[in-house]
Amino acid sequence: MSRAAPFTVLIPARLASTRLPNKPLADIAGLPMVVHVARRASQSGAQRCVVAADDARIVQACQAHGVQALLTRADHASGSDRLAEACELLGLAGEDIVVNVQGDEPLIDPRLIDAVAALLHARGDASMGTAAHAIDSAEDFANPNVVKVVLDAQGLAHYFSRAPIPHARDHAPGSLWWQPGQTGVPVGFAPLRHIGIYSYRAGFLRRFPQLPAAPTEQLEALEQLRALWHGHRIAVHVTGSAPGAGVDTPADLERVRTLLGG
């Protein structure tokens, strides 16, 4: 992607976390985790990187380290709602591109951010962009915490699911049909793992929270299914590099601290 193609990175950060309280402020090598995320994101081609926080303590921690941050309402139901408010606060135009980088991804690859932003610069018919990576184990294919995505020939998402999709009709019901090295698989097929990074047009992001929730979204607990349900297209970048580990638990935090020297 040309680094001249403009976009803004927004990083939602919420202080409350069931499994890891005060997660955005967790210390990693002497810096709050959300600052690590912002610094990684700033290595992309983004014009600016902004943290959208629900608590003044996050804003203060970011500003102390030179990271732009906004205080948003604390009662937002989702990160998308928080980002929609941030778009308003920043005065972004409807066609401006926004990339949503999660605040618990201190190992995010800046090149992935660029690639997901580039999807919307290249695809005027898409309202959203995201990323995926080939699944390389039967365990991940079966794991409901590993979200799968199926694409069409144009690289647009057909569907996202926690189930192992697609399913091979002739395989025994109730058993896993795919594993690495599986024979009889159509040429070019590989199951894909969804990576939780998104690009949006700011106008769509403002409207998204007002769209009625989709039945599929409610069943799968996957917010992106709302966009598909209402007829919006999601372009998908398939990366050859496995994504960096996110931080959801104390064990994840210790692993990242080891990797980043803290």
Swiss-Prot record:
Q: Which pathway is recorded for this entry?
A: Nucleotide-sugar biosynthesis; CMP-3-deoxy-D-manno-octulosonate biosynthesis; CMP-3-deoxy-D-manno-octulosonate from 3-deoxy-D-manno-octulosonate and CTP: step 1/1; Bacterial outer membrane biogenesis; lipopolysaccharide biosynthesis
Which UniProt key words apply to this protein?
Cytoplasm, Lipopolysaccharide biosynthesis, Nucleotidyltransferase, Transferase
Documented EC number(s) = 2.7.7.38
Highest taxon, organism lineage? Bacteria
Listed GO biological process terms: CMP-keto-3-deoxy-D-manno-octulosonic acid biosynthetic process; lipopolysaccharide biosynthetic process
Name its cellular compartments. Cytoplasm
The catalysed reaction is: 3-deoxy-alpha-D-manno-oct-2-ulosonate + CTP = CMP-3-deoxy-beta-D-manno-octulosonate + diphosphate
* Primary localization class, coarse: cytoplasm
| UniProt cross-references to InterPro entries, sorted A to Z | Cytidylyl_trans, KdsB, Nucleotide-diphossugar_trans
**GO-annotated molecular function:** 3-deoxy-manno-octulosonate cytidylyltransferase activity
A Gene Ontology cellular component where this protein is annotated is: cytosol
Q: Which residues form a coiled coil?
A: none
Family recorded in the similarity comment:
Belongs to the KdsB family.
Cross-referenced PANTHER family: 3-DEOXY-MANNO-OCTULOSONATE CYTIDYLYLTRANSFERASE (PTHR42866), 3-DEOXY-MANNO-OCTULOSONATE CYTIDYLYLTRANSFERASE, MITOCHONDRIAL (PTHR42866:SF2)
Q: What does this protein do?
A: Activates KDO (a required 8-carbon sugar) for incorporation into bacterial lipopolysaccharide in Gram-negative bacteria.
What is this protein's name? 3-deoxy-manno-octulosonate cytidylyltransferase
Query: Which species does this protein come from?
Result: Acidovorax sp. (strain JS42)
